[in-house]
UniProtKB/Swiss-Prot annotation:
The gene is fadA. This is 3-ketoacyl-CoA thiolase. GO terms for cellular component: cytoplasm. The keyword Transferase applies. The active site is at C95 (acyl-thioester intermediate), H347 (proton acceptor), C377 (proton acceptor). Heterotetramer of two alpha chains (FadB) and two beta chains (FadA).
């Protein structure tokens, strides 16, 4: 494949193990530390890259308060070997924050405003709960459904609109845990996970090497015993087929193709296209459909051209309508979330966009795919998507 000088390429991508938000392995580790460990690992793994070349550190984070406040990207940068002369910014597109960080860096590279960027995201949902400090405007209900801020109810709505049954959701949830467990046992996460010091259940220091969120014993039958979490009377969405609350971070090293070539680096992939799109906040989980269609159109591609997909599993009730309307139902087991997803691994809000992209790029490398799409829904009615081409 020939590369244009301003093509945006990925040199490397990593993530932390995923820890439970409630009394999990990272309960005594701060968000900045999780992130800084990954950034230094990128430079350890790619010693031809001088940290002084980093134009900007761009970090996704949703709840920017407490330890995640006051431009957490800069707080993180100051803990790494990136020099003080490089800049840093924190971005927030709710669930799509880390993918927006990727897009922001890519746009800068494409327009000649920098050659080397470190991007990613973090969310410590144990230390900074999802709605910490949020003050919802009551007047918003004049303009969008009052339940739009209640993500579980938006998933219930999508399931009803698309005829997704409780059994389908339970089977999809069990699939996520099964595939993530298999990926762990077979070492498929080994290249993307950076081990980080945390604590075990007894409080002793421990090197955390694997995701602690995966429940290998999960079956569709066991999930069928759970009560609805958001609509007790007639709901189908349960905690067991929803994304977990977790602590985690992810990081990527992005570069212009010409700088990568000058440094003698072999990129993993390049960005073919990017897109964001809006949808009705009451069905926020549908956002990946218009975003993906827009990104594919910009790349001159069709759904059938894509070898592998990573869809953030906010809820099974949300993922299945997206899969259905992207016409992927018949190829799920060959192409979609082959190492499990957020139902098993969790959804640390500001981290997930880079996490799913990292997992996708490793799946593409392992299985020989050329084209991949990472896409996710975003609270309040948005979607974001990236089309990747393996080099």
């Amino acid at each position: 494949m020939s590369l244009n000088p301003r093509d945006v390429v990925v040199i490397d991508c990593v993530r932390s193990p995923m820890g439970r938000a409630k009394a999990g392995c990272f309960r005594n580790v701060r968000a900045e530390t999780l992130s800084a460990t990954l950034i230094d690992a990128l430079f350890d793994r790619n010693d031809k890259v001088d940290p002084a070349e980093v134009e900007d550190l761009i970090w996704g984070c949703v709840n920017q308060t407490l330890e995640q406040g006051f431009n957490v990207a800069r707080q993180i940068s100051l803990l790494t070997r990136i020099p003080h002369t490089s800049s840093a910014q924190t971005v927030n597109r709710l669930c799509g924050s880390a993918m927006s960080a990727i897009h922001t860096a890519a746009q800068a590279i494409m327009t000649g405003n920098g050659d080397v960027f470190v991007v990613g995201g973090v969310e410590h949902m144990g230390h900074v709960p999802m709605t910490q400090g949020f003050d919802h405007n009551p007047a918003a209900s004049k303009y969008s459904a009052k339940a739009s801020n209640m993500m579980g109810l938006t998933a219930e709505m999508l399931a009803k609109m698309h005829g997704i049954s409780r059994q389908q959701q339970d089977e999809f949830g069990a699939r996520s845990h099964r595939l993530a467990h298999e990926a762990t046992l077979e070492g498929r996460f080994r290249n993307e996970i950076i081990s980080i010091q945390g604590h075990d259940d007894d409080g002793f220091p421990a090197l955390i090497e694997n995701d602690e969120t995966i429940r290998p014993e999960t079956t569709a039958e066991s999930l069928a015993q759970l009560r609805p979490a958001f609509d007790p009377k007639s709901g189908t969405v349960t905690a067991g087929q929803s994304s977990q609350l977790t602590d985690g971070a992810s990081a990527m090293l992005l570069m212009s193709a010409e700088r990568a070539q000058a440094l003698g680096l072999t990129p993993m992939a390049k960005i073919r296209s990017m897109a964001t799109a809006g949808c009705d906040p009451a069905i926020m989980g549908y956002g990946p459909v218009p975003a993906t269609k827009k990104a594919l159109k910009r790349a001159g591609l069709k759904v059938e051209d894509i070898d592998f997909w990573e869809l953030n599993e906010a809820f099974a009730a949300q993922s299945l309508p997206v899969i259905k309307d992207l016409k992927l139902m018949g190829v799920v087991d060959q192409k979609v979330n082959l190492n499990g997803g957020a139902i098993a691994l969790g959804h640390p809000l500001g981290c997930s966009g880079a996490r799913i992209s990292t997992t996708l790029l490793n799946v593409m490398a392992a299985k020989g795919g050329t084209l991949g799409v990472s896409t996710m829904c975003i609270g309040l009615g948005q979607g974001i998507a990236t089309v990747w081409e393996r080099i």
